[in-house]
Amino acid sequence: MMDLDNIPDTQTEAEELEEVVMGLIINSGQARSLAYAALKQAKQGDFAAAKAMMDQSRMALNEAHLVQTKLIEGDAGEGKMKVSLVLVHAQDHLMTSMLARELITELIELHEKLKA
């Protein structure tokens, strides 16, 4: 992983940052996809599978959040990092995935209560 304490000045470092940001998008998307798959399992009454998928979703989201935290720490609120459209897209993916997981957790609990 690139050194996020030194925000890129060269094309190679910019490419490394883009790779890190793409990882953020991929992990966020994975977290959201797994959460929706868990909801599908809950609708079918398979709460063990739903829980396992939500656990996997949490791990993917934790990976994404770790990258986000390092990016924020690297910038330290000083505007060192150039904000690209891809970075904004990655942040959007992360936030929508976090929201989806929170809502899906509630929906799974409701399905569980309804099936009891």
Curated annotation (Swiss-Prot):
Entry note: cofactor: Can also use copper and nickel with lower efficiency.
GO terms, biological process: N,N'-diacetylchitobiose import; phosphoenolpyruvate-dependent sugar phosphotransferase system
NCBIfam families named among the record's database cross-references: EIIA-LAC (TIGR00823), PRK10454.1 (NF007768)
Protein name: PTS system N,N'-diacetylchitobiose-specific EIIA component
UniProt keyword annotation of DNA damage present: no
Entries under CDD domains matching the protein: PTS_IIA_lac (cd00215)
Domain of life where this protein originates: Bacteria
